[in-house]
């Protein structure tokens, strides 16, 4: 029997927007416990997004949330070993995991970009995700295509 699951920790909302989602994103962005630096990077990235997309009617937080929703995957493939063969079985993703995957993908592909500061890279990735482009969006589409290709094995889900 497995151990009991640990309790979920309460995540405090951030000071500027009052959003727990922002705090989760910043926690993923943070290195070495430097949360204030991560918040500064995030807020300056949102300011740069606001400058780049000045013709949009939405606020910078709404643009970021829309970009995050654009790169949120719906299905993923998991390896299942059945009868000596390994199958890529498409499975739906739980809502919390969807959010975590999209945040981590956005940060990962922002870090891989060329640019001077992390705020520049993150703002460029947010703009690309908002426009359904960029590395994080491509990753989501690749996951969807792989699940689509392997949907014949969906009955192996347990």
From Swiss-Prot:
Gene Ontology CC entries for this record: small ribosomal subunit
Q: Which GO terms describe its molecular function?
A: rRNA binding; structural constituent of ribosome; tRNA binding
What biological process terms from GO does the record include? translation
Note the InterPro entries from the entry.
Ribosomal_uS7 (IPR000235), Ribosomal_uS7_bac/org-type (IPR005717), Ribosomal_uS7_dom (IPR023798), Ribosomal_uS7_dom_sf (IPR036823)
Alphabetical UniProt keywords: Ribonucleoprotein, Ribosomal protein, RNA-binding, rRNA-binding, tRNA-binding
Q: List the Pfam families.
A: Ribosomal_S7 (PF00177)
Which intervals of the chain form a coiled coil? none
SUPFAM superfamilies for the chain: Ribosomal protein S7
CDD domains this protein is in? uS7_Bacteria
Q: Quaternary form? A: Part of the 30S ribosomal subunit. Contacts proteins S9 and S11.
General function of this protein: One of the primary rRNA binding proteins, it binds directly to 16S rRNA where it nucleates assembly of the head domain of the 30S subunit. Is located at the subunit interface close to the decoding center, probably blocks exit of the E-site tRNA.
Report the HAMAP family cross-referenced here: Ribosomal_uS7_B
The family line of this record is:
Belongs to the universal ribosomal protein uS7 family.
What is the protein name stated in its UniProt record?
Answer: Small ribosomal subunit protein uS7
Identify the gene encoding this protein: rpsG
């Amino acid at each position: 029997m497995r151990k009991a699951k640990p309790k979920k920790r309460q995540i405090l909302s951030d000071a500027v927007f009052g959003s727990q989602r922002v705090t989760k994103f910043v926690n993923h962005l943070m290195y070495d416990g430097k949360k204030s630096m991560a918040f500064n990077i995030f807020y300056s990235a949102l300011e740069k997004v606001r400058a780049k997309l000045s013709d949009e009617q939405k606020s910078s937080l709404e643009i970021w949330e829309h970009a995050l929703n654009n790169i949120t995957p719906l299905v993923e493939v998991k390896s299942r070993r059945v009868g000596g063969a390994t199958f890529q079985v498409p499975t739906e993703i739980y809502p919390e995991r969807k959010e975590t995957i999209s945040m981590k993908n956005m940060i990962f592909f922002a870090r891989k970009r060329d640019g001077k500061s992390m705020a520049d890279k993150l703002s460029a990735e947010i703009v690309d995700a908002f426009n359904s482009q960029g590395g994080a969006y491509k990753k989501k589409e690749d996951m969807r295509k792989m699940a689509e290709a392997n949907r014949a094995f969906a009955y192996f889900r347990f």
